[in-house]
Amino acid sequence: MIRLGGLFPEHLNLNGDFGNLDVLKAQLEWRGLSCETVKIERASDLTSDLDFIFVGHGSVAAWSAIHLEFEALAPTLRLLLEGGTPGLAISTGFEELVRTNVFTGLEATTMATRTSKFEVYKDGDNEVLGYLNTDVNLPILHRERNWVASMLHGPILAKNPFLLEEVLGRITSYAGVQLPVIYESEKAGQLADLIDEVWKLEKELASE
């Protein structure tokens, strides 16, 4: 059983960020692998049998509400990261992992102006599509150990198949299983069509 953990889902899902966890679970199940999602709200929830950890995006008020709990579990998050547990962090989730030194070598500083736009970001030979809304100077995409972090909002994995495959590969490799192809070709085709439509719309917006 592959276990996918999500931190504070009631607080860190401002732009549908937990859609990333949903698409991972659906993809694993479509490929014939059993998995479950679990809620993480305290350090004791961060157990070694987790195969993936997700940190979403929240408002200032949301982060204020969970501030003490997040501070308490940050050292355990760092230990799991160092031990190879895969993860994904989105927008302010990324910022907080930098602030609490779960991610190292980065500094989150506030810029004079806020950037709010659809973004197509070049990542090697690939492009990453998403919406950027921040006044912090962190990189749009960052990888550390087995984690991926992005300043782009929302369900980034649903829009970017290569990034989805990368994260799925990290999860299954850590869990010690092979990543099969999707058995149900009709679902795979429908997903590809949906992604194409999203790319068409948002690339047009990004070029405006």
List each model region and its residues.
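N-terminal beta1-alpha1 cap of cysteine-dependent amidohydrolase-like domains
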Residues: 1-75, 79, 165-208
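Short, acidic Gly/Pro/Ser/Thr-rich loop/turn segments
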Residues: 11-14, 60-62, 137-140, 155-159
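Structural motif
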Residues: 52-56, 88, 149-151
